[in-house]
Amino acid sequence: MKACERLLLKIESQEKFVEEFKRILLELGLTLKEFSEISGIPYSTLYKVIQGKDFRVSTLIKILKTIRSFEKDENIDTIAIIAARPALNKITTRKIGINGKSYLIKEYPANSLEECIVAAVRAEREGVKGIVCAPIVSATIEKIVNVPVAVIIPEKDAFMKALEIIAKKINE
């Protein structure tokens, strides 16, 4: 059953509706803030929904339309990005077009080697077509999963900026 249909079936009870909406957000890998940005529903309105407060039918319609748009995207190939949360926060889009083909981007936060491996296995199980990760974990991940793996190589400017920061700290 599609997420949209599941949510509508829970409309009879506010508690069940809120519980199902939270579950759908988890399945989509979205925070309430991200859902707000995608749907155009103000964050404060969505917060009221999550708190079990009454809301307008127009809000329900927008929620359902947004969830449906993700269901349509299920046929689009997904690429996983495994990185620390601060790096993932710099990603501003959920969909990207490359060579005329659209891809969904799914974030997998990880802060250790073990978390990267777990995220890679989870991503593969969830059906991603490829994984982007840091060079230090790519060799290990390539041995574990059966999807293509690409690495993120920091730009020269990133290294220079880090060197400048550490030099300032040393001289303080």
Curated annotation (Swiss-Prot):
Residue ranges of domain HTH cro/C1-type in the record: 21-75
GO molecular function list: DNA binding
Feature: DNA-binding region: 32-51
Entry-linked InterPro entries: Cro/C1-type_HTH (IPR001387), Lambda_DNA-bd_dom_sf (IPR010982), Tscrpt_reg_MJ0621_prd (IPR016472)
Pfam families, alphabetized: HTH_3
Domain of life: Archaea
Keyword field: DNA-binding, Transcription, Transcription regulation
CDD domains in the cross-refs: HTH_XRE
Protein name: Uncharacterized HTH-type transcriptional regulator MJ0621
Source organism of the structure: Methanocaldococcus jannaschii (strain ATCC 43067 / DSM 2661 / JAL-1 / JCM 10045 / NBRC 100440)
